[in-house]
Amino acid sequence: MDARRKHWKENMFTPFFSAQDVLEETSEPESSSEQTTADSSKGMEEIYNLSSRKFQEESKFKRKKYIFQLNEIEQEQNLRENKRNISKNETDTNSASYESSNVDVTTEESFNSTEDNSTCSTDNLPALLRQDIRKKFMERMSPKLCLNLLNEELEELNMKYRKIEEEFENAEKELLHYKKEIFTKPLNFQETETDASKSDYELQALRNDLSEKATNVKNLSEQLQQAKEVIHKLNLENRNLKEAVRKLKHQTEVGNVLLKEEMKSYYELEMAKIRGELSVIKNELRTEKTLQARNNRALELLRKYYASSMVTSSSILDHFTGDFF
């Protein structure tokens, strides 16, 4: 793909003429065509300088913003590590605080130096360190917030990608326009070498600009692919969490049903025991009532017998005393 893009760029920006071709031409250009060519070259140079300054300013601002965020994350991590060391080693609090202050000063100085020379700081900062800091920062965030942040970064990368594509297309159109103008208008023999070198310089500058933009597009595409992979991973984790919650809910429902059945069986068993004990007590009470009734009848019979025996004995005694007297 890179070879095809390079071949396409070479075909697109191949000059239509060289110094030798111009020297071999015998046509004499007019003064009006010379003035028009000079004006078009000057306008082309002004447009390129304006677009180049604008792109450099935007790149500088974005680098400053990204470096400021990285420095804030590094400073926060250093402060947390220092606090952790202070809590572990209470005897070394002074040295730990001194180290944390040195870290703050060094980070502030590094931020100021990167603010003065932002184009070099991003190149000097290792890519692995930036990835490690970004990974730790993403791990501390919740999955939902991380997903929202990645969606925002994805939208921002898409906007940057579209903007760079538009700038790339506009630059191609401008190149085609100026190449057609230069090809259709004759050049002065005396200014041919100067104009050719200037045009080559401008074309080379535009090639470099387009190459840089193509690199930016490639980097943005890689970042976009990484963001998509992270989003896919988070979606899988979210799906797994939902499945785990569903299983846990199902287990809870099954446990509740089993607990209800167990409580019901225990209640029925206890009620059966109580009914059995109640029936035993009723039987004992019935037996006791029967025995009491039997005893009452026996006492009644005994009372009657005793009363009758007393009457008989008194009559015998009276008869005996009468006979005696």
From Swiss-Prot:
Region feature Disordered, mapped onto this chain: 18-45, 81-123
Regions that span the bilayer: none
Compositionally skewed regions (Polar residues) per UniProt: 92-123
Keywords linked to the UniProt accession: Coiled coil
Bias kind Basic and acidic residues: ranges: 81-91
Coiled-coil stretches: 144-288
Family: Belongs to the CCDC160 family.
Protein name (database record): Coiled-coil domain-containing protein 160
Organism, as annotated: Homo sapiens
